[in-house]
Amino acid sequence: AVSLYLNSFQHLLRWKRDYRSWQVEAGGQVIFIENHSRAGTGFVPVIPNYTETQAGIYGIGKYHLARGGVEAGLRLDMQETRASGYDWTGSPYGGTRKFNNVSYSLGGHYQLSKGWRLTSNFGLAWRAPHVYELYSNGNELGSGMFVRGDSAMHSERSYKWISSLRYGDGMFSVC
């Protein structure tokens, strides 16, 4: 049977301050993951032993108006993945990958009239590849498929714009 040891550590820190019409928030996040397979089980895990360190800091500023408000945010992220293992042929494989990114968002809302509210937000999102996507190499026990990762894979980035017009009168609402 496959036997894996997983240790993880997460820490979040958030600071928030209100000053008149302004609201400011800043924070950070650290995640450490260590995953190792137990030797001597007779099975070769589909992913190698790995450690992953993620860290991020962010800031958000909001300004409130009588009938609406605006907000902007910025986030800096980094991720380092170190993997080392043996594939089903007994050959060593793995490596170290580092990913960095800056993401942002800009949004606002406005009360058009009684019951009507317009909201819009635009932002850049980011996701670094998981160790499975980078270094999987072997038989996946749950599906019986042979899978192989791509250690040259880059992080994903996407833009997202959401706008909505909402009406609500207390008894009824529609978006």
Model-derived segments and their meaning:
Residues 34-36, 78-89, 96, 110, ...:
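Surface-exposed extracellular loop regions of Gram-negative outer-membrane beta-barrel proteins
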Residues 164:
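Small/polar-residue-rich segments within soluble enzyme cores
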Residues 167:
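Flexible glycine-/small-residue-rich
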Residues 1-111, 123, 170-175:
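Face-selective signature of the C-terminal outer-membrane beta-barrel domain
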